[in-house]
Every structure is written in C-alpha cells, then in structure tokens.
Curated annotation (Swiss-Prot):
Record-listed E.C. numbers: 2.1.1.199
Annotated InterPro entries: RsmH (IPR002903), SAM-dep_MeTrfase_MraW_recog (IPR023397), SAM-dependent_MTases_sf (IPR029063)
Function: Specifically methylates the N4 position of cytidine in position 1402 (C1402) of 16S rRNA.
Reaction equations catalysed: cytidine(1402) in 16S rRNA + S-adenosyl-L-methionine = N(4)-methylcytidine(1402) in 16S rRNA + S-adenosyl-L-homocysteine + H(+)
Lineage: Bacteria, Pseudomonadati, Pseudomonadota, Gammaproteobacteria, Pasteurellales
One record GO biological process: rRNA base methylation
SUPFAM superfamilies: Putative methyltransferase TM0872, insert domain, S-adenosyl-L-methionine-dependent methyltransferases
Residues at which S-adenosyl-L-methionine binds: 40-42, 60, 84, 106, 113
Compartments in which it is found: Cytoplasm
Keyword Cytoplasm in annotation: yes
GO CC list: cytoplasm
Species of origin: Pasteurella multocida (strain Pm70)
UniProt name for this protein: Ribosomal RNA small subunit methyltransferase H
Family: Belongs to the methyltransferase superfamily. RsmH family.
Keywords: Cytoplasm, Methyltransferase, rRNA processing, S-adenosyl-L-methionine, Transferase
Amino acid sequence: MNDKDHFSSPAHITVLLNEAVAGLALKEKGIYIDGTFGRGGHSRLILSRLADNGRLIAIDRDPRAIAEAKTIQDPRFHIEHRSFSDIPRICERLNLVGKVDGILLDLGVSSPQLDEAERGFSFMKDGPLDMRMDTTQGLSASEWLQQVSEQDLAWVLKTFGEERFAKRIAQAIVNYNKQALQHGTEPLSRTLQLAELIANAVPFKDKHKHPATRSFQAIRIFINAELDELESVLKSAVQVLAPQGRLAIISFHSLEDRMVKHFMRKQSKGEDIPKGLPLRDDQIQRTQTLKVIGKAIMPTEQEQQQNPRSRSAVLRVAEKL
C-alpha cells in the first residue's frame, strides 16, 4: 500500500498527496500548518513524518472537516475551526509568528463536499442550493441569488467563472426569482433547478463541459470569498514562516493559480530598481522574500486516471529567504 492509498479515504482521494508534502521539505521537529484540513490526507501524512516534538496545526472552516479532525488523537496535532486567512492571528495567539517551517494549502472544494448533495456544490446531484464552506455563517447561494442584481450577478459569473454567457445566465436567474416573488412561488432553491435554468440560457453547449460548470464555480467562489481569503493569506504567509520555511499551494482553477504564481514570482524578484540610479550593488536594499522551488507540478497521468478531479490541480512551492 502506498502513501496515497493509506492517507486517503474512499470518499476523498487527496490530490498530489506525496508531492505536496515533499514540497514542504519536512523537518522531523518542525512546526507546520495545514490550512485546509479537508478529510485529513495531507495532515495524516505530515504527522507520520514528524518526531515526537514536531507540531501540526490544522485549519478548516467546514464543520464536517472539524469533526473528522477531532478523530485524530495526537498530542502533536491541533485543529482550528477557522478560515486559513486567520493563519496570522492563530500564529500570534500561539506565539508562532516567524517560527512556522511550512504552510500547506489545498484550495477548492473537497470530494466529500461535492459528493454530499445536501451541501449544494454539485450541479450533478439534487440538493439545497447552499454552497457555503462554513454552513454556520453567511448567506447560502439561494439566499444571495434572491437579492443580487442582474448586473452584479453577471459581473460575478464573468469575473469568477470566466463565463462567456454571463449576461444571459444572470438575466435568466434574476427573472426566475422575480417571477417567483410576483406569483408567490418558491425561488431558486435546488442545485438541479439552477443547473437546468443555466443550461437553457446558454445558446451553445461545450461537449466536454456541463454548461453550469463555470457558473457554479463563480457563485461558490463569491459566496465563500475564496479569492479574498487567498489574497489575505498570501500577504501574511511570509511573515509567519521561519527562514527556509516552505509555502506549498495546490490550486484548481486558473484564477487561483494566476494569483499564486504572480505572488511567488513577485516575492522572488523583489521590487524593480529603476535603471540608471547612481547606486552600487551593495547600496540597493533587496526586497526578495521568497525563492521559487522548482517548476509547477501537475498530477501524473496515473493519478488523473485514478482521480479525474485532480486533472486541473497545480502545485507551486516557494521558500522564505
């Protein structure tokens, strides 16, 4: 049995399991943060490689992930029901700022979240139109769609889903909910109901992709403020890490990956110094904070066959200077 089999469950195959943990360059006595515990695949593998005085802090905003984490009885392990954007505050409380040897983030929706119809993430299964990572906070997708304007919805679909038919889809959704309000009928409240409405609004179908794919992604990203969360943690990660500490991030769509790639490149190059200034090299204050480690890593063909949901995954790793 390999690590991927041992540290994944039938309900959730951890994507890029060995590659992500290898990217952290684990020290046996190190302090690590798994910012997206999920169902614990990465955390369990990290724990298996730490010495008795190693330490792992895991974070997740999904109550079901927290319940899963609480089954781990290990004095080296600590779970926080928070968002990963809270990493700096957690580290301040635990006196770990500048002491963390590695941070791992596995972005996106986990397989159990997609597979559990009642979570409302899937356009393939009928369930309540929820889409919240943390079901204890904020508006559900259904509630938000009942109050959003057509213009704002089109912007969300275009910006976060890169949906070419954003205006058509937004118009169809807002009109449906307006008519429901006028006639006293139920507004959009089920996943398959929304998926069908989107499919009917789209004039051209992609043979290889469900017409609701981009819209569901966009609504989910907006509802959960996913890109804001990512931007926030990127800004604070360098401060939290110890020198030579690693940042390993797995992203699943181009918006996330562009943000991660741009951040790591910018931090590894530092601020541009205008040419022609009368400064010696030793007078220039270097602003590089990270070193990019290797190239982006994608799942192997074998992993993609075993877990089709891994196809779009990209792992990027950087090290604090």
